[in-house]
């Protein structure tokens, strides 16, 4: 078993002596609350008394409220999304976003059964299945359970991952292999299981969650950066291969996201991280989830093989 919680550091200086700063691991969020828009009433104004034989003036009316912008995508009907690492963090935020949009939702979790149960209570009808994505046998059992319970998988969000802060010279062969097994082979396993059905239907969406550290480099996490960079390569190559079958493959690369994984960081730590970020704040898991939801929809049907950074300008 592995521990999903680690503390990471990064150095963003472009010049001069580098100093190491602590950075958080990538996944993890707070629940987004979407309030319904307030209802606006149209009221008739009272009609003033008019002189005899003089027609009363027309009552004044308040202007009609502006119409809400409508998506060009058709309503979501009978679509299922499978999210690995969906019990908390970015995965849980994605589960909430897809659920609110009308998807059937299945989440895979590794060891945190309590968090998975809490998500099921919050979102009635969500399926939670235990799965170690690094194990092909575990993926096959979990994927079969999801298909039997909810039907075909229309959208796969490969989000499960681990991180570790360690000097390159101190990384053991076992730690190196485990990082690749979870962060890269895990995506390979789930994508191979999802693709046959998508190819038969000539439709499907595959979304991978990499990291800005797969686009650039971070200190003391060479194995993590290597695995996440490999995930970007896997996404692009697979996109080219399956596009003729009506399947699009896209990648989201989050930066420093404010989630429960940052609970050990002090207010000073968070302030320093925000100062390093060009937009002046940390990202939220809900922001990443909204992008995943958009990329899964019909409005994003012309997009494939691309990497979308959600990093506040840290990587440009």
Each language-model region and where it sits:
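Short, small/polar-rich loop/turn modules that mediate ligand/substrate recognition or access, typified
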Residues: 243, 248, 303-305
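Substrate-binding pocket helix/loop in short-chain dehydrogenase/reductase
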Residues: 167-168, 175-180, 262, 269, ...
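C-terminal substrate-recognition "lid" of short-chain dehydrogenase/reductases
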Residues: 188, 199, 203, 281-310, ...
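Active-site helix of classical SDR
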Residues: 191, 227, 235
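Alpha-helical segment proximal to the catalytic Tyr-Lys
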Residues: 196, 240-241, 301
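Residue(s) in the substrate-gating loop at a strand-loop-helix junction
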Residues: 211
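Catalytic Tyr-X3-Lys loop
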Residues: 162, 169-188, 203, 207, ...
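Conserved glycine-rich cofactor-binding loop
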Residues: 87-88
């Amino acid at each position: 078993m592995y521990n999903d919680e680690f503390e990471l550091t990064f150095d963003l200086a472009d010049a001069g002596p580098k100093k190491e700063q602590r950075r958080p691991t990538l996944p993890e969020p707070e629940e987004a609350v979407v309030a319904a828009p307030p209802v606006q009433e149209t009221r008739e104004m009272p009609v003033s008394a008019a002189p005899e034989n003089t027609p009363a003036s027309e009552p004044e009316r308040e202007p009609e409220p502006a119409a809400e912008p409508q998506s060009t995508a058709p309503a979501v009907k009978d679509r299922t999304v499978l999210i690995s690492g969906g019990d908390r963090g970015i995965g849980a935020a994605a589960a909430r976003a897809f659920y609110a949009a009308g998807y059937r939702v299945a989440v895979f979790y590794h060891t945190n059964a309590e968090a998975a149960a809490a998500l099921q209570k919050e979102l009635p009808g969500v399926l939670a299945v235990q799965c170690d994505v690094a194990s092909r046998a575990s993926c096959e059992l979990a994927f079969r359970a999801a298909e039997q319970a909810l039907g075909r998988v229309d959208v796969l969000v490969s989000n499960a991952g681990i991180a570790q802060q360690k000097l390159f010279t101190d990384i053991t062969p076992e730690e190196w292999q485990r990082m690749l097994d979870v962060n890269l082979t895990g995506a390979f396993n789930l994508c191979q299981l999802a693709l046959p059905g998508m190819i038969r239907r000539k439709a499907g969406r595959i979304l991978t969650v990499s990291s800005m550290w797969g686009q650039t480099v971070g200190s003391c996490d060479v194995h993590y950066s290597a695995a996440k960079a490999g995930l970007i390569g896997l996404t692009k190559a697979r996109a080219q291969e399956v596009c003729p079958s009506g399947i699009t493959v896209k990648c989201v690369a989050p930066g420093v996201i404010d989630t429960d994984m940052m609970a050990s960081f002090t207010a000073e730590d968070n302030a320093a991280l925000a100062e390093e970020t060009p937009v002046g704040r940390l990202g939220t898991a809900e922001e990443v989830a909204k992008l995943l939801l958009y990329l899964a929809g019909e409005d994003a049907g012309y997009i494939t093989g691309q990497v979308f950074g959600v990093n506040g300008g840290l990587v440009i």
